[in-house]
């Protein structure tokens, strides 16, 4: 069945969201139109404002409406000479939720992927190199995803940091707390054995 052009456009627009197929998009559109137009207007306003006003921090590249994000602008960060390199702004939120890191971040907004046309320029590595060359960074902590692309990106950045004589470390990978060994994949288990620590 064909809907009106505006309803079709709404359904198609909702499909741009990750994990939203035609049926889910249709359900969302109908929910907003049938039962919650007020929320639909609020969503439209928030989306419009965010798309217009949210940009990237000039220092770390995470999302912000200001020139500097709250983390980079804060004078209360205890270890401002530490930079944790992550792939996405969501990674920053995950690390911040843990409350164990008080340094700064650098958000790549992706990972190296030559087949997809993503190289060092697309990841803002010239800005990261500027930070490294400033002499204000004592350690770079690489927290890219444990994938082939994430590992390649980490090695590329590690080589870059070593040229500036900056210490480089990578977050540990292994068995999750509370996890059972029988459910852990062999690669993760191998990383756990290789990264074991003395007690």
UniProtKB/Swiss-Prot annotation:
<dbReference type="GO" id="GO:0006310">
    <property type="term" value="P:DNA recombination"/>
</dbReference>
<dbReference type="InterPro" id="IPR000093">
    <property type="entry name" value="DNA_Rcmb_RecR"/>
</dbReference>
<dbReference type="Pfam" id="PF21176">
    <property type="entry name" value="RecR_HhH"/>
</dbReference>
<dbReference type="GO" id="GO:0006281">
    <property type="term" value="P:DNA repair"/>
</dbReference>
<dbReference type="InterPro" id="IPR015967">
    <property type="entry name" value="Rcmb_RecR_Znf"/>
</dbReference>
<comment type="similarity">
    <text>Belongs to the RecR family.</text>
</comment>
<dbReference type="GO" id="GO:0008270">
    <property type="term" value="F:zinc ion binding"/>
</dbReference>
<dbReference type="Pfam" id="PF21175">
    <property type="entry name" value="RecR_C"/>
</dbReference>
<keyword id="KW-0862">Zinc</keyword>
<feature type="domain" description="Toprim">
    <location>
        <begin position="81"/>
        <end position="176"/>
    </location>
</feature>
<keyword id="KW-0479">Metal-binding</keyword>
<keyword id="KW-0233">DNA recombination</keyword>
<keyword id="KW-0863">Zinc-finger</keyword>
<comment type="function">
    <text>May play a role in DNA repair. It seems to be involved in an RecBC-independent recombinational process of DNA repair. It may act with RecF and RecO.</text>
</comment>
<dbReference type="InterPro" id="IPR034137">
    <property type="entry name" value="TOPRIM_RecR"/>
</dbReference>
<feature type="zinc finger region" description="C4-type">
    <location>
        <begin position="57"/>
        <end position="72"/>
    </location>
</feature>
<dbReference type="GO" id="GO:0003677">
    <property type="term" value="F:DNA binding"/>
</dbReference>
<protein>
    <recommendedName>
        <fullName>Recombination protein RecR</fullName>
    </recommendedName>
</protein>
<dbReference type="InterPro" id="IPR023627">
    <property type="entry name" value="Rcmb_RecR"/>
</dbReference>
<keyword id="KW-0234">DNA repair</keyword>
<dbReference type="InterPro" id="IPR006171">
    <property type="entry name" value="TOPRIM_dom"/>
</dbReference>
<keyword id="KW-0227">DNA damage</keyword>
<dbReference type="Pfam" id="PF13662">
    <property type="entry name" value="Toprim_4"/>
</dbReference>
<dbReference type="Pfam" id="PF02132">
    <property type="entry name" value="RecR_ZnF"/>
</dbReference>
């Amino acid at each position: 069945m064909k809907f009106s052009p505006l309803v079709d456009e709404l359904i198609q627009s909702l499909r741009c969201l990750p994990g939203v197929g035609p049926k889910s998009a249709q359900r969302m559109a109908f929910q907003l139109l049938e039962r919650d137009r007020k929320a639909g207007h609020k969503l439209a306003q928030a989306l419009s404002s965010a798309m217009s006003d949210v940009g990237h921090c000039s220092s770390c590249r995470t999302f912000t409406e200001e020139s500097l994000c709250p983390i980079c602008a804060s004078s209360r960060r205890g270890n401002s000479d530490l930079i944790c390199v992550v792939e996405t702004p969501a990674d920053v939120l995950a690390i911040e939720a843990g409350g164990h890191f008080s340094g700064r971040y650098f958000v790549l907004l992706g990972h190296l992927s030559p087949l997809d046309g993503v190289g060092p320029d697309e990841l803002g590595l010239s800005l990261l190199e500027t930070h490294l060359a400033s002499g204000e960074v004592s350690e770079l902590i690489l927290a890219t995803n444990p994938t082939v692309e994430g590992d390649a990106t980490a090695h590329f950045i590690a080589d870059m940091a070593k040229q500036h004589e900056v210490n480089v470390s990578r977050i540990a990978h292994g068995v999750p707390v509370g996890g059972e060994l029988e459910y852990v994949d062999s690669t993760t288990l191998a990383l756990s054995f290789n990264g074991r620590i003395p007690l």
